[in-house]
Structure formats: C-alpha cells, structure tokens
Amino acid sequence: MPHKRRNRVHANQRNFTARRVSVAKLSSAPPNVLVESCNGSHADNSSPDSPKAKEGAMTNGKNPEIKLAVPKCNTTVRKQNEAHIISNIKLDMNLNKDSNFIAPQITKKMNFAPNRVVFGVLVPLNVNDSVLVPHNRKPDALKHTSKESESCKAISEPQLADYAEKVDPMIMAVKEPVLHLDWEPGPFDFFGAYRRTYN
C-alpha cells in the first residue's frame, strides 16, 4: 500500500493558526521609548496615555524601555553655531563715494555697442605673428625716406614686427662622421662575381 503524502495546505493551515494565537497574546499597547541625547540631557517621547517612566526604572516587565540617541545636526564645513554667526553678519555698506562712483563707470564701459568707440586712446596693433615682416615693406625702401613716406607711416597700421625683437635663427649643426676605408684599391672582376653569384 503506497504511503499517503501529507497535503501541504493542511500543514500551512496548522502553522498559521498557531501563529495567529501567539500574535493575539501580545499586547497591543505601544512600547515605552526613552530618548537620551549624547550630552546627557533626557527627553521622553512616550505616548501621552502611558505614564512617564522614572530614570533606570521599567514600567512593565514585558515592555522594557528602549533607549535611542537624539540625532545631532552637523555641517561638513564648520559647526552649527559658527554657521549661525556667519549668516547673521551684516556687511558695512557705508563705503566711500568714490568707490561707489567707479563701479557704475566700469559697468558702463563694459556694456557698449560694437560700433561705439569706448577706448579711443588705444593704438590698434596687428598681432598676426605668422607674418612678422609686413608684405608692403621692403628693406631697401626703408633707407630712402621722404615726407610722403613719413606721413603714410603715421597713418598705416602698426605691425607686430615693429615691437618684437629680432631673434637669430637657431641652426643645429650636425657633424658628419669621418669614414676610414681599409682596403687596397685594385681591379675588380665583374664577370667572375657574376658567375659566382648565378652558378
């Protein structure tokens, strides 16, 4: 006769009923919690219905006091009181009248239209360093000066070559090695070398 397998549903029902009975026996009242901070001050966060517990005493034998620590508020840069002091600092706005007048003028200079000349005293300078020597100038033409050339020079745009110092080109001299050939010059047998190669 084959062995009867126990039905899994009946086994689960038996365990579930035992668990339900054990849960029903527990008290539904909230636990008494005593909160202690790290600096020694005590605070009571228990429910308003339950009486306040004394220090080191237990209200019930079943529900002991659970001591929890109070969270501390810290900052990553400095302590909390220093952060409050810095936030309460008020700057002295009674500055000099000259400094109050200079700042709007700087802002006024910076906010200008593209076609408006703000800094008229500056000299325009061509800073194209790819061509240091201007194309329209020749070294021979600089020797012969006249009144017309001087007037054109004053009107023309200054070049970067006028302000840059002349640097001599650097030449890296590599000496060639001295070869010593050690053999006696004589007639060479080309046909004999050809026969030795291909025979």
Swiss-Prot record:
Domain of life of the native organism: Eukaryota
Location relative to the cell: Cytoplasm, Cytoskeleton, Microtubule organizing center, Centrosome, Centriole
Keyword Zinc attributed: no
Species this protein is from: Drosophila melanogaster (Fruit fly)
Residue ranges, compositional bias (Basic residues): 1-11
Family, similarity comment: Belongs to the PPP1R35 family.
Protein name as annotated: Protein PPP1R35 homolog
Function: Participates in the later stages of centriole assembly through the interaction with Ana3 leading to the centriole to centrosome conversion in somatic cells.
Subunit structure of this chain's protein: Interacts with Ana3; this complex is recruited to daughter centrioles before their conversion to centrosomes.
UniProtKB keywords: Cytoplasm, Cytoskeleton
Null allele phenotype: Homozygous flies for rcd4 are lethal at the late pupal and adult stages. The flies that emerged are slow and uncoordinated. Female mutant flies are sterile. Male mutants are fertile.
Region Disordered, annotated ranges: 1-23, 36-60
Biological-process GO terms, alphabetical: centriole assembly; centriole replication
UniProt biased composition (Polar residues): 38-49
